[in-house]
């Protein structure tokens, strides 16, 4: 299993659950977690996924031969939290590149370089389907990811290709959201309330649900919520 964005949050939880279930896991990103560097079935490839040149040079090919290979495009950033016109070119470019472009480029490599049975997943978001004030770049990037998954699923009906909505998860990104101002993000009070009431989903719950979906053989929607597949 290849997972991007494994240093914390959902990606780290997916890696831990996959290792527990016996998968070989290769993480891709800037910071290697000890979980992968110290585990016999773990490995890590250093690559800044917001760097187009580094991403273009990256190869997913491996000498190992697997019965099945799964790519989970999980790396992402909240991006600029402010009215759209106040976001800088650099902020917008970084958000779109990391959240959408890198996932598309990695998926293209995955589909062409990896042989055998394949499954492809993207960490999506409810923000792909609802306009949230202050999150213009994030909403747009996640909408792009959802549509890309839908198109690839049509182009490759023989493969399992999905984007999953994890819901509001207790991750560093949520802490970043709570640290914003009401001026930049009018909905911040709701996210603070969700955290203080203990309503956030644990990353481990999302990971368990996703691995359950990966192991299923029946058809499921291309875009799905992990909360519908809890174990």
Where are the language model's segments positioned?
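N-terminal Rossmann NAD(P)H-binding glycine-rich loop of SDR-like oxidoreductase domains
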Residues: 7, 15
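Conserved glycine-rich Rossmann-like NAD(P)H-binding loop of the short-chain dehydrogenase/reductase
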Residues: 21-35
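Rossmann-fold cofactor-recognition segment
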Residues: 39-53
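Conserved mid-core segment of classical short-chain dehydrogenase/reductases
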Residues: 78-93, 134
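Active-site helix of classical SDR
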Residues: 107, 141
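Residue(s) in the substrate-gating loop at a strand-loop-helix junction
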Residues: 125
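C-terminal helical subdomain
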Residues: 163-166, 171, 179-231
């Amino acid at each position: 299993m290849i997972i991007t964005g494994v240093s914390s949050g959902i990606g780290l939880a997916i890696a831990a659950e996959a290792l527990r279930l016996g998968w070989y896991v290769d993480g891709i990103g800037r910071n290697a977690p000890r979980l992968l560097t110290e585990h016999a079935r773990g490995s890590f490839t250093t690559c800044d996924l917001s760097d187009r040149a580094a991403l273009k040079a990256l190869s997913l090919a491996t000498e190992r031969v697997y019965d099945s290979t799964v790519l989970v495009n999980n790396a992402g950033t909240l991006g600029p939290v402010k009215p759209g016109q106040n976001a800088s070119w650099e902020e917008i470019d970084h958000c779109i590149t990391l959240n959408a472009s890198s996932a598309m480029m990695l998926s293209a490599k995955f589909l062409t370089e990896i042989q055998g049975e394949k499954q492809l997943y993207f960490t999506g978001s409810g923000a792909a389907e609802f306009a949230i004030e202050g999150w213009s770049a994030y909403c747009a990037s996640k909408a792009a990811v959802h549509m890309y998954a839908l198109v690839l699923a049509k182009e490759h009906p023989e493969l399992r290709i999905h984007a999953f909505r994890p819901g509001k998860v207790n991750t560093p990104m949520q802490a970043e959201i709570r640290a914003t101002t009401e001026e930049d993000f009018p909905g911040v009070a709701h996210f603070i309330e969700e955290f203080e009431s203990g309503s956030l989903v644990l990353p481990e719950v999302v990971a368990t649900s996703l691995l359950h979906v990966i192991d299923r053989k029946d058809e499921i929607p291309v875009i799905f919520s992990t909360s519908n597949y809890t174990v």
